[in-house]
A protein has these predicted regions:
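SF2 helicase motor core recognition
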Residues: 11, 103-106, 115-141, 145-169
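Conserved helicase ATPase core of P-loop NTP-dependent helicases/translocases
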Residues: 84-121
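Conserved helicase/translocase motor-coupling segment
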Residues: 1-73
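Conserved helicase motor "Helicase C" RecA-like lobe of SF1/SF2 P-loop NTPases
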Residues: 60-94
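Short helix-terminating capping/connector loops at secondary-structure junctions
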Residues: 47-52, 85-88, 164-171
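A conserved SF2-helicase RecA2
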Residues: 147-203
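Conserved nucleotide-binding/hydrolysis micro-motifs of P-loop NTPases
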Residues: 61-63, 98, 123-125, 143-146, ...
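Short beta-strand segments
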Residues: 12, 53-60, 89-95, 117-121, ...
């Protein structure tokens, strides 16, 4: 059982970015970080006039102060260096060490001065009312429970989203990144089976 957990952990990390397993691996134009940065930049520029905002979720590779490398910071680097997005407009919820700091970031998202907010399910999936300008939600990984995925999407897909209502047909795009023949496929199927079972119980 312990070996299975270790193998699963490695498989999750490998699907996200090989550098999480071994820092010796080099960046790759076809990894999740590269694809995600490109998609974020597309939405950023598409909704520049409206100051549209985006949420980016991942429970792996989260920002840790003082850490040499993490997926959040890598995508932020790409956004700044490759796509010209100002670094101060990209924030990590883990940077907020107080409720006051957290509220300031949420207010900045609603104001459009922060345009991209990264976070994990536990830290960003609930209690964040920053939906006012949300145009896209990105999932770098998928949680194990359907309810967690719903909570993530609920940061933008909810009442009070003015930009989606006025400029995007009252829709928020949800982008899920996956690697073929990886643990991602297994997790998607598992989520689908769980959601189907839950729906059958409710009906």
């Amino acid at each position: 059982k312990a070996k299975m957990l270790i193998a699963t952990d490695y498989a999750r990390k490998m699907a996200l970015d090989m550098r999480m397993v071994d820092p010796a691996y080099e960046d790759h134009p076809d990894n999740k970080a590269s694809h995600c940065a490109r998609m974020i930049a597309e939405y950023y520029h598409k909704y520049e006039t409206q100051k549209g905002t985006q949420f980016v979720f991942s429970d792996l590779g989260t920002y840790q102060p003082g850490e040499n490398w993490n997926v959040y910071s890598e995508i932020k680097r790409k956004l700044s260096e490759d796509y010209g997005i100002p670094a101060h407009e990209v924030r990590f919820i883990q940077e907020c060490k107080s409720e006051k700091a957290r509220k300031a970031v949420i207010d900045a998202m609603n104001a459009g001065t922060v345009r991209v907010l990264f976070g994990s399910t536990s830290m960003l999936g609930t209690g964040v009312n920053a939906q006012k300008r949300c145009v896209a939600i990105h999932h770098l990984d998928t949680p194990w429970r359907p309810s967690d995925l719903e909570q993530r999407d609920g940061r933008g897909v909810r009442a009070g989203n003015e930009i989606a209502k006025l400029y995007a047909g009252n829709k928020v795009d949800v982008v899920i990144y996956a690697v073929e023949k990886s643990l991602d496929s297994y997790k998607f199927n598992l989520l689908h089976c769980k959601q189907t079972f839950i729906s059958q119980l409710k009906s």
